[in-house]
Every structure is written in structure tokens, then in C-alpha cells.
Amino acid sequence: MLERTLSILKPDVVKRNITGQVNSYIENSGLKIVTQKMCLLTRFQAEEFYAIHKSQHFFIPLVDFMVSGPIIVQVLEGENAISLYRELMGATDPKKANPGTIRGDFAENIDANCVHGSDSLDNAVREIRFFFSDYELLSLK
């Protein structure tokens, strides 16, 4: 099934200037980057986006990291894009991520783990709308 998913290239990817390499992994997997933009999250935006994790011990460090520098948000499209991208990202903890995955090949640690990807169709819709307006998405149809 043709799906869209949200991808975030986190501040560590932008800071280390490896966005092109990560994008190559995405495109070589068969996923299409249909739109992307660079932005700098405010603390409020980061807290809102990750609100589901508010009660977790990693919430504050995650928010701190996500506001530490620019990010790149992307809409990816392809057959079974959500599960394909999650497989391509690799395990959250790069020590457990397989070689050939984004985190396995590029992530420095569990906090600076390079990427975020939607984990379900419902979350993909919500997360894409969080970063992209209807106007921005209209031209993608």
C-alpha cells in the first residue's frame, strides 16, 4: 500500500553535515522524499511533538536535544513507507542497530540517534500535519 511517513533528521545529522548521506540511504531504499524543510524547533513545539513521552525519564533530555540545533523534516512516500522506513532507521539504541541501517551506520548514541520516523499510519498523518500546512501538502497530490 502506498503510504506517507514523517522523517526527522535530528540536530546531530545536520551538525555533522551528513544529511546527504542519510538522504541517500532513504532514496536507495526505494522511498521518495516528496518534500523537506529545515527548521529550528522551539521548546514549546518540541514538548508538544513529543508530549506522548512526557512521563518518561528521557523526555527532558530529548526536548533539550531536539532544540539544540536545526532539524530537517521530510515527508517520505512509497509502498509500506512506514514499516520500510522504521526498518531502515534501525533500533533506537545504535548499539543494537544492524549495520546498513541509518542508526547502525551513523548514530553516536541513544540520545543522538540521527532520525525519527512515524510508527503508525495515524501518527504519520498527525506528525506530517504538525510540520506541514495543508497548503504545503496540496502541491504533493
From Swiss-Prot:
One GO-annotated biological process of the protein: CTP biosynthetic process
Statement: the UniProt record of this protein carries the keyword Transferase: yes
Single GO MF annotation: ATP binding
Protein's recorded name: Nucleoside diphosphate kinase
CDD domains in UniProt: NDPk_I
EC number of the protein: 2.7.4.6
Organism: Ehrlichia canis (strain Jake)
Keyword set, alphabetical order: ATP-binding, Cytoplasm, Kinase, Magnesium, Metal-binding, Nucleotide metabolism, Nucleotide-binding, Phosphoprotein, Transferase
Reaction(s) the record says it catalyses: a 2'-deoxyribonucleoside 5'-diphosphate + ATP = a 2'-deoxyribonucleoside 5'-triphosphate + ADP; a ribonucleoside 5'-diphosphate + ATP = a ribonucleoside 5'-triphosphate + ADP
Enzyme class: transferase
